[in-house]
Amino acid sequence: MVKSILASVLFAATALAASRMTAPSGAIVVAKSGGDYDTISAAVDALSTTSTETQTIFIEEGSYDEQVYIPALSGKLIVYGQTEDTTTYTSNLVNITHAIALADVDNDDETATLRNYAEGSAIYNLNIANTCGQACHQALAVSAYASEQGYYACQFTGYQDTLLAETGYQVYAGTYIEGAVDFIFGQHARAWFHECDIRVLEGPSSASITANGRSSESDDSYYVIHKSTVAAADGNDVSSGTYYLGRPWSQYARVCFQKTSMTDVINHLGWTEWSTSTPNTENVTFVEYGNTGTGAEGPRANFSSELTEPITISWLLGSDWEDWVDTSYIN
């Protein structure tokens, strides 16, 4: 009986950790050779903006140096990166890189390596980087500008402003997010970060992970980081207490870290003001629940608080969240 149960568990684990090495039927294939297109942008340009059917792009192994803009579509979009294990970003085989700084364009969004305006889009197993680095200041890897967007087992890397979670309901699951300054930021999105690995870089003497820009009580914006990890990126020597969980870009900022493991890179205060001249702390919602590790130890800033129970994904995203979220990535 024990052997039978063990065999069933191992079978289930194997099934969950499936590879995705071939394109599904009907997908537009991007490949260095032999595909429908040799750039991701060309594949996106081939999408119908009027069809209400689900469209799929499959990207084969390789490094693609380009800025990708996905416009608003009438139907759902699925983008798959080739991978040996769909459950983890560590097996991703597709890298999308570009280097644009804010100084070169009109706004933050235009610096992003991936600019996604497609509502109802699901992005799987892509490594997306803005390689501009510290000297460029604001330089995004991903700009998420629509609702019902899901990012699964992806990897986002940058320095400042890595991820702009800007509009609508969004999910980031099993995803690696790396940066140094305000690298999860935005104004209006309700975003659920599920089992993400958040990694900080050496360089700044003091910096924050999140910068939520909710500017009024009526705005829906809320970032919830759930069952995730916070630590220094591999190869980075980050001093104890260098980082804060967040600072308020606007005066009604809302961020929650819950059931998340934190190393000592997090300052004991947990949260910090926007600046000494503009603290923006009077109306913030900076909360935690059940965090662990040295970085979870206080005393915390007096404008933050501890919840008595965790926020649920259904409260944040609505009772119909399972209609658009890939629940196989949500435990």
Curated annotation (Swiss-Prot):
Pathway: Glycan metabolism; pectin degradation; 2-dehydro-3-deoxy-D-gluconate from pectin: step 1/5. Keywords: Aspartyl esterase, Cell wall biogenesis/degradation, Hydrolase, Secreted, Signal. Gene3D superfamilies: Single-stranded right-handed beta-helix, Pectin lyase-like. Transmembrane segments: none annotated. It comes from the Eukaryota. The keyword Hydrolase applies. Involved in maceration and soft-rotting of plant tissue. One of its GO terms (molecular function) is pectinesterase activity. It is found in: Secreted. The record marks 160 as: Transition state stabilizer. One of its GO terms (cellular component) is extracellular region. Belongs to the pectinesterase family. This is Pectinesterase. The active site is at 161 (proton donor), 182 (nucleophile). Its main location: secreted.
